[in-house]
């Protein structure tokens, strides 16, 4: 019985992770090209008898945000991410609008994964020698060229799927593996 509860809990967590990743990707698609880069402060270490350990930096003011063409910007105090100090998976966020007061603030922000940016962002260009993919000339992600090829193929398949759904509203988009593949990529951020 206890094992069944544990498995049910694991299933709920996995389902929630899939839903959360999918919703964030949809938000990314809807708000793109409003993308900001998150720059964390340098990591600090504390010397201990067993070696150096990373210390947690709890000061949100040390986290910096940048928007191409505007330089440094700030998260609006009403945002849920205003006091955030941990950005585990992605140094990118999307925002709905900018507001200029004493500072330039971003409103309604949402963290997005690199995979969401690759799938739903702008034009991709590959820099083979640097092993990077650049989105719209200003969002640089470290990845081999083969990732760009696969992402382009996924984008093409998704566009075909969406075009068919528009042409045939009764078409079941869940019938194929394209959507499942995209959701798995978003959930794992391409790690699988």
Protein language model features and the residues they cover:
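C-terminal accessory domains/tails appended to large, multi-domain proteins
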Residues: 4-7, 11-192
């Amino acid at each position: 019985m206890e094992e069944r509860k544990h498995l049910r809990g694991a299933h709920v967590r996995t389902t929630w992770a899939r839903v959360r990743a999918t919703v964030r990707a949809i938000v990314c698609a809807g708000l793109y090209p409003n993308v900001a880069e998150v720059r964390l402060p340098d990591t600090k270490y504390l010397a201990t008898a067993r070696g150096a350990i990373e210390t947690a930096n709890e000061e949100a003011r040390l986290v910096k945000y940048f928007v191409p063409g505007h330089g440094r910007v700030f998260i609006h105090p009403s945002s849920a991410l205003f006091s955030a100090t941990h950005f585990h998976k992605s140094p990118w966020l999307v925002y709905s609008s900018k507001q200029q007061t004493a500072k330039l603030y971003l409103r309604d922000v949402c963290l997005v994964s690199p995979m969401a940016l690759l799938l739903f962002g702008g034009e991709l260009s590959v820099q083979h020698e640097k092993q990077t993919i650049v989105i719209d000339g200003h969002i640089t992600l470290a990845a081999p060229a083969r990732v760009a090829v696969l992402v382009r193929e996924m984008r093409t398949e998704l566009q075909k799927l969406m075009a068919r759904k528009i042409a045939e509203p009764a078409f079941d988009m869940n019938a194929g593996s394209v959507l499942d593949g995209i959701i798995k990529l978003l959930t794992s951020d391409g790690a699988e």
